[in-house]
């Protein structure tokens, strides 16, 4: 049975300290899982599927990941940065190619890869929250199907959750509520809500992470 979940991701996933109210869902995921599951959060801001590999961050995970561990991958926000070519990947070519490196690397170590679509931003029209990364979500789903990999559609889950809660409530989930011109990053409150959605996705997939006792918080 898996005891570790390694997280590869960006600033919406990474762990932040107590000096800021900013949070990433990766720092809260463990509190919604059985106590024997250890979440090791290697997500870091500003990285795309490409730069996370190029900087050796994927390899650093693969050096320590063990058989039957899990590698959760949420990438896409920074992949979409056309104005930053060092980060940018094209959804249906290079993005998919890089995702497949994570998948192959995990499997070579006897671990289980899982893909997570990019989480939604604070962007809505007429009360409905919008997907800012549609091509990356489609490309990730294609990759999951092609490689027979489990996927949690966090974009879909977060959009539905935000639309249900409404703009005023969701406003408090994002750093824009802290007086910062930031429609992407979460407050700790918002990050914890996203962690709940990921935990729900784990349960829905019936993953061998003792889903029957995932905490309902």
Swiss-Prot record:
Q: Give the domain of life.
A: Bacteria
SUPFAM superfamilies named among the record's database cross-references: SGNH hydrolase
User: Which CDD domains does UniProt cross-reference here?
Assistant: Rhamnogalacturan_acetylesterase_like
One example of the protein's molecular function in GO is: hydrolase activity, acting on ester bonds
- The protein here is known as Probable rhamnogalacturonan acetylesterase YesY
Q: Which organism is it from?
A: Bacillus subtilis (strain 168)
List the keywords (alphabetical): Hydrolase
Q: Which residues form the active site?
A: 11, 178, 185
Enzyme Commission code: 3.1.1.-
> What upregulates or represses it?
Up-regulated by growth on type I rhamnogalacturonan.
């Amino acid at each position: 049975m898996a005891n570790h979940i390694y997280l590869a991701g960006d600033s919406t996933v990474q762990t932040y300290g107590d000096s800021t109210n900013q949070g990433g869902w990766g720092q809260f995921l463990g509190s919604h899982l059985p106590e024997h599951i250890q979440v090791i959060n290697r997500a870091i801001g500003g990285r795309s599927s490409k730069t996370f590999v190029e900087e050796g961050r994927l390899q650093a995970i693969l050096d320590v990941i063990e058989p039957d561990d899990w590698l959760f991958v949420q990438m896409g926000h920074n992949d979409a940065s056309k104005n930053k070519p060092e980060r940018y990947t094209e959804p249906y070519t290079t993005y998919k190619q890089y995702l497949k490196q994570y998948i192959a690397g995990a499997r070579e170590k006897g671990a289980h890869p899982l893909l997570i679509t990019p989480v939604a931003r604070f962007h809505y029209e007429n009360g409905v929250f919008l997907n800012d990364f549609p091509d990356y979500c489609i490309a990730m789903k294609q990759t999951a199907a092609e490689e027979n990999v489990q996927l949690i559609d966090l974009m879909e889950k977060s959009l539905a959750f935000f639309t249900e809660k409404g703009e005023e409530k969701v406003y408090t989930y994002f750093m824009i509520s802290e007086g910062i011109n930031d429609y992407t990053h979460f407050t700790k409150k918002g990050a914890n809500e996203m962690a709940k959605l990921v935990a729900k996705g784990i349960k829905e997939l019936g993953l061998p992470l003792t889903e029957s006792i995932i905490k309902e918080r």
